[in-house]
Amino acid sequence: MRILLIEDDMLIGDGIKTGLSKMGFSVDWFTQGRQGKEALYSAPYDAVILDLTLPGMDGRDILREWREKGQREPVLILTARDALAERVEGLRLGADDYLCKPFALIEVAARLEALMRRTNGQASNELRHGNVMLDPGKRIATLAGEPLTLKPKEFALLELLMRNAGRVLSRKLIEEKLYTWDEEVTSNAVEVHVHHLRRKLGSDFIRTVHGIGYTLGEK
């Protein structure tokens, strides 16, 4: 899951980016309001964590512009503004959730996962395809009921494919979902991850659509 984080507090921002990265999220972090606002237009983010008090452009103005321009990415407001009127205003501007500082990182992750479930119309955290089960919240994967050991990028790729079952995902889109701007990506990185997953899940689990990308095979 690729997350856009817009937070000007260096300590908080670093803690969120580091903590979520360890949980398997890919996080792009911006400290300036305008830069963060523009970032949403240039990459396929799954969710946004937005502070309200930002240099350059207030978080409420950013959110208002996104919604007016049709951006529908789920937004979690994370701010010290805890007054009822502030929370109501943020939600009415188009935020999907609101969390006041101080916070526990595990709750931030849980709220992001809940936003993704609602976005994808899921009732449960678990993703299933054939005899493969994935629980992104618990970072658990099983094959025919047996524990499956996956590296972080393998887990992220499998989650992406399972969340988009029935769709063909291009290599470019997969790269954009799996890697942040400050990560180096080799030309065959996606192919390598697909190869490793096929070795663990079976050669037919991921299907190559030549000239287009990858999709899950038949159940």
Curated annotation (Swiss-Prot):
Modified how: Phosphorylated by QseC.
Regulation: induction: By the signal autoinducer AI-2, through MqsR.
Gene Ontology biological process terms from the UniProt entry: DNA-templated transcription; regulation of DNA-templated transcription; response to metal ion
Domain of life, per lineage: Bacteria
Subcellular location per the Swiss-Prot or TrEMBL entry: Cytoplasm
Key words, A-Z: Activator, Cytoplasm, DNA-binding, Phosphoprotein, Transcription, Transcription regulation, Two-component regulatory system
DNA-binding region: 124-218
Pfam families for the chain: Response_reg, Trans_reg_C
Any single Gene Ontology cellular-component annotation: protein-DNA complex
Domain Response regulatory: 2-116
Modified residues (4-aspartylphosphate): D51
Gene Ontology MF, one: phosphorelay response regulator activity
Reported function: Member of a two-component regulatory system QseB/QseC. Activates the flagella regulon by activating transcription of FlhDC. Currently it is not known whether this effect is direct or not.
NCBIfam families in the record: PRK10336.1
Identification of the protein by name: Transcriptional regulatory protein QseB
Organism: Escherichia coli (strain K12)
UniProt lineage: Bacteria, Pseudomonadati, Pseudomonadota, Gammaproteobacteria, Enterobacterales
